[in-house]
Structures are given as C-alpha cells and as structure tokens.
From Swiss-Prot:
This is Odorant receptor 59b. One of its GO terms (molecular function) is ionotropic olfactory receptor activity. Its main location: membrane. It is found in: Cell membrane. Belongs to the insect chemoreceptor superfamily. Heteromeric odorant receptor channel (TC 1.A.69) family. Or2a subfamily. GO terms for cellular component: dendrite membrane; membrane; plasma membrane. The gene is Or59b.
C-alpha cells in the first residue's frame, strides 16, 4: 500500500495543505496532457501530446461512432448497437465536459490559492486532523473512480474482443476487423486506447467537483469548531474575542469565494451530465436486461456504476454542504454571546444572517444540484425501460 500512501491520513507532525487532496487528480491531468511545463523545449513536446488525447477522445470518437452507424448499421446485433450507442451518447457529453474542464483549469488553481489562506487559519491539532483526513479522503475517492472507470474500459475490451467482435465498433478507415484475427485485435486495441483517452478525460471532469466540495465541507467543519470556541477562553479580552469572530466571518467569506470561483465550471459540466444521464442509463439497463450475456453484462453494469458516479456522490456532497450552512447558523446562535459587548452581538447577528443563505450550485442556471434533481433526471431511464417492455421492442430486435 506504500504506492498509494496518500489515501491514508498523514501524521499531524507533517504539514499538509488542502491542495494535496488533488495530487492524484493532477497526476492524471499531467498524464493526459493538461498540465504542461512552464518553459523549455519540453513544453512544446508536451503540448503536442496534449493534442493527441483531444484529437482522439474529443474529436475522433464522436465522429467515428456516427460514421460507423451509417456504414455498418445492418451488421450490428441489438446488444452491440446498444453497447455502442450508450457509449456514443456519453462520449458526446464527455467531449463537452472535458473541453470545459480544460478551458477552466485556471479556476481550480485560483480556488486552491483561496484554500491556502484557509489552511493558515488552522489553530490546533483538531483542525489539522480534519484537513489531513480530508486530503486522504479526496485521494482515496479519486483512486476508487480510477479503478471503476478503467475497469469498465478493460472489461468491455476483453468481453467483446474475446468473443470475436470489436468492443465499441468505432469507424476505422484503415482496418477492417473482419479480415482476420490479427485485424480484429488491432482494431480492438486501437479502440481501447482511444476510449481510454475519453474515459480518463471524462473521469477528470467528473471528479474535480467532488474533490473540491469535499474540501469546502472540511473547512466548514473547521469553521464550526472555531465558532464553538468563541468567547470560551476566559483569559482573552473582549477585543481578542471580537477579532476571533471577525476571523470566522472572513473564513466564511473565503469559503464562499471558493464556491463562487468554481461555480461557473461546475454549472456547465454538471448540466451536460444531467442532460444525458437518463437516456444513457436507460439504454444501458435495456442492454443488460435483454441483450447481454454474463461477461458483457458485467461490463455494462460497470458502465452503469460509472454513470451513477458521475453525479450522485457530488450531488450528495452538495446536499451536505447545504446542511453545513444550517448547522453553522445553529452553532453561531448557540455560541457564548449572551454577555458580549454590543459590537460583538451586532456582528454576530449579521454573520448569522449571511450564513443562513445556503451554498447552492445551479446546473446550467436551471437545475439546483441536489439529490432530488439527480433522481429526477435519472428517472427517465425507467421510462425508456417501460417503453421497451410495453412495445415488446426487445423481442422484435432479437
């Protein structure tokens, strides 16, 4: 486990920053070509590599799927077509999401600078322990996403290639996989590499919102601890107590600035996913229920898990962030303010008023990002299954 030492909290004697929760995330970004060197010849070599995953994952795959449907539609079995179509729809969404994420990477960097200022406010070992646990939790979550996303790509590749078919049936102008076993495996490996670009780009677009909201929640917990300790030290003067309150207000403003900095980025990527999740999930479940054998079913179920992971954990964290604001308001009200000076009380009232406004992210300026919204858009999957059952479409396509 030494290879993945970042998934365990570092000892309190070791200095840890919030941004270290993104170490695995940024390593994956570096691998896919999103973080070039700042200068030197290697920067230009690296920029060429940046273009390769974009060329295949963002541009070639969406076009390749459509050409394949036009030229090879009559050769598809129902299961192969659904496997290809469910991924095709998701690939279009992933192309948009990864492009948005890449163009707005500067927002992540600026958010980390704001988080650095919050790290400086850690007052004791309890605060540091929360941040250490958060850093480990973020890296652990990214690792789980990596295993599941890569597991889907690998299982689909093997289940179809071993059955004598290309995994996603993407158009390839240079190879006809029907020419023999060698051509089949060349096509399958080419599709796997190309799809791996898209899968990793999609993973990066899906994980950064979760990573950063986990960080925001950790600092909200630290802030709640600081609010609980207000005016609890009898040795501190009223001026010191007032400064402690002001620091809490400033910390809350910094957390709001973090959310505002990353909000336009999250709004766009989650809106794209909300728009697609129902149809992709529905087609995948139809494929599992009616057209898959065991191993292809395993690959499709892994795809279902990846689709659910794209939004559900983040939406749950958004719900918790809303609850954190309410909890913080309660902590402020229950703090030791009764015999405080008028200036302290006036500032406390204003602080509590601002805290009562929950931190909400809006997808595309339309859907509040929450578990309720996620479940609502995901319900469309069951509508697709109902239509297939009532019209006996599965039997007609057998």
């Amino acid at each position: 486990m030494a290879v993945f030492k970042l998934i365990k909290p570092a000892p309190l004697t070791e200095k840890v920053q919030s941004r270290q929760g993104n170490i695995y995330l940024y390593r994956a970004m570096w691998l896919i070509g999103w973080i070039p060197p700042k200068e030197g010849v290697l920067r230009y070599v690296y920029l060429f590599w940046t273009c390769v995953p974009f060329a295949f994952g963002v541009f070639y795959l969406p076009v390749g799927f459509i050409i394949s449907y036009v030229q090879e539609f009559k050769n598809f079995t129902p299961g192969e077509f659904l496997t290809s179509l469910q991924v095709c729809i998701n690939v279009y969404g992933a192309s948009v999401k990864s492009t948005i994420t890449y163009l707005f990477l500067w927002r992540l960097r600026k958010t980390e600078i704001l988080l650095d200022s919050l790290d400086k406010r850690l007052a004791n070992d309890s605060d540091r322990e929360r941040i250490h646990n958060m850093v480990a939790r973020c890296n652990y979550a990214f690792l789980i996403y990596s295993f599941i996303y890569c597991g889907y790509a690998g299982s689909t590749f093997l289940s179809y290639a071993l059955s004598g078919r290309p995994p996603w049936s993407v158009y390839n102008p240079f190879i006809d996989w029907r020419d023999g076993m060698g051509s089949l495996w060349i096509q399958a490996i080419f599709e796997y590499i190309t799809m791996s670009f898209a899968v990793l780009q999609d993973q990066l677009s899906d994980t950064y919102p979760l990573m950063f909201t986990i960080m925001f929640r950790a600092h909200m917990e630290v802030l709640k601890d600081h609010v609980r300790s207000l005016r609890m030290d009898p040795e501190r003067s009223e001026a010191d107590n007032y400064q402690d309150l002001v620091n809490c207000v400033l910390d809350h403003k910094t957390i709001l600035k973090c959310c505002d900095m990353i909000r336009p980025m999250i709004s766009r990527t989650i809106f794209v996913q909300f728009a697609l999740i129902g149809s992709v999930l529905g087609l995948t479940l139809v494929n599992v229920f009616f057209f898959s054998n065991f191993w292809k079913g395993v690959a499709s179920l892994l795809f279902v898990i990846t689709i659910l992971l794209q939004t559900f954990p983040f939406c749950y964290t958004c719900n918790m962030l809303i609850d954190d604001a309410q909890d913080l308001s309660n902590e402020i009200f229950q703090s030791n303010w009764v015999d405080a000076e008028p200036r302290y009380k006036a500032t406390l009232v204003l602080f509590m008023h601002h805290v009562q406004q929950p931190i909400i992210f809006i997808a595309g300026g339309i859907f509040p990002i929450s578990m309720n919204s996620n479940i609502t858009v995901a319900k469309f999957a069951f509508s697709i299954i109902t239509i297939v059952r009532q019209m006996n479409l599965a039997e007609q396509f057998q």
